[in-house]
Curated annotation (Swiss-Prot):
Record family assignment: Belongs to the Omp25/RopB family.
Keyword Membrane part of the UniProt annotation: yes
Record's subcellular location: Cell outer membrane
Major location category of this protein: membrane
The protein's name: 25 kDa outer-membrane immunogenic protein
Keyword Transmembrane: yes
Source organism per UniProt: Brucella canis
Keywords for this protein: Cell outer membrane, Membrane, Signal, Transmembrane, Transmembrane beta strand
GO CC annotations, alphabetized: cell outer membrane
Length: 213
């Protein structure tokens, strides 16, 4: 009887410690609460933008009197456009206007380029934070021929096409590099009674910086 009484007393004394240990185990066995996952905001190319460009042009002017002349030089200007976006496809319209310092003479005939501009469609693929794209449209440029006796300047219209890569530098600042090929139609120039037929092709590499609204 005394043994049974002793067991009851010992069990009663250990009961609080057992309950505490069980409660501690229950608390420890609860699964940890997963930390919230932060989702980065999706960048959109949609909207308007504008910027400046600097480039270099490799030109080839074919003439009916002295053959080919290659007036290569720097160019600079501004561009602006508007993008639309559906999933990863980016499309829109862009225009640019600038000035080319290309000028060269051969056998007394000088070819000089001046104002140039274009209006183009553009389509790209969003690889956030960069976008490769293709572009094509119409182009125009002021081109002057001079043979030392007479000079004539004409505004020429042609077509242009190219490809580029645009990158998001910040939420609003864009950087780009672009290649363009442009061909201007044949034109006749009347230089002191001599008719000179001219065709001009240009190849440009341009780098630009822009601001997205």
């Amino acid at each position: 009887m005394r043994t049974l009484k002793s067991l009851v007393i010992v069990s009663a004394a250990l009961l609080p410690f057992s309950a505490t240990a069980f409660a501690a185990d229950a608390i420890q066995e609860q699964p940890p609460v997963p930390a919230p996952v932060e989702v980065a905001p999706q960048y959109s190319w949609a909207g308007g933008y504008t910027g400046l460009y600097l480039g270099y042009g490799w030109n080839k002017a074919k003439t009916s009197t002295v053959g080919s002349i290659k007036p290569d030089d720097w160019k600079a200007g501004a561009f602006a456009g508007w993008n639309f976006q559906k999933d990863q496809i980016v499309y829109g319209v862009e225009g640019d206007a600038g000035y080319s310092w290309a000028k060269k003479s051969k056998d007394g005939l000088e070819v000089k380029q001046g104002f140039e501009g274009s209006l183009r469609a553009r389509v790209g693929y969003d690889l956030n934070p960069v976008m490769p794209y293709l572009t094509a449209g119409i182009a125009g440029s002021q081109i002057k021929l001079n043979n030392g006796l007479d000079g004539e300047s004409k505004f020429r219209v042609g077509w242009t096409a190219g490809a580029g890569l645009e990158a998001k530098l910040t939420d609003n600042i864009l950087g780009r590099v672009e290649y363009r090929y442009t061909q201007y139609s044949n034109k006749n120039y009347d230089l002191a009674g001599t008719t000179v037929r001219n065709k001009l092709d240009t190849q440009d590499i341009r780098v630009g910086i822009g601001y997205k609204f």
